Amino acid sequence: NDSISKLYVADGEDSGSSSLLAPRESEITFSTSQEITVKKFTSLGLKNIDMVVIDTQGYELEVLKGFESYINAIPCFIIEFANYEGYLKQPVYKELNLFMRKKGFVPIAQIKRINKPFPNINGGSFGDALYVDKKLLRKSEIIFFTIRYYLINLIIYDAFIFFKKRLKKSLKRYIGR
C-alpha cells in the first residue's frame, strides 16, 4: 500500500510549510521537490495508540483515510486544520470535520489562529482541533460540544475576534502616546 509522492519543499525558515500538496502562489517559495514514500498507517503495524497528532500541511484528510478501519481503535486525535485552501486541492476544515464526525468523533476543543476575518485563498483561520471518540462521552457532553463547535466556527465569530484584536492594538498605540 506504499506509494511514491512528490513533496514540495519550502525554502529557508518557511520549511515547515513543505507539503505533499502543490503550493498556491504566496510569499513562501518552494524551489525544490523530492520523491518520498508515503505509507498507510495500517502498514506500520502499530497497536495500542491513545492519541494521534496530525500536522501535514493540508494532507491531514488523506492521512486520516490511511488509518482505514483502525481509526475507531484510537480514542483521541489532534488535527491541524484551515478554513481556507492554503495549498491546491487542500480540504478545508468543514470537510475534515465531516469525515471525523462520520467516523464517530466529536470536536472537543480548538486552538484557533485568525489571520484574515473572512476566508479566501490567501488566508482565514487555522489551528488545531481535538477530537474524541463519542463512545467516551456522555450524551449531554456530546450536545454541549456540538453546540460550542457551531458557535466557534461561525465566520462572524472569526471576524469579531479578528477586529477585537485589531482594536486592542490600536487602543494600546493611541493610549501609549
What role is predicted for each listed range?
Residues N1-R177:
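Phosphate/nucleotide-binding beta-alpha loop and adjacent structural elements of enzyme active sites
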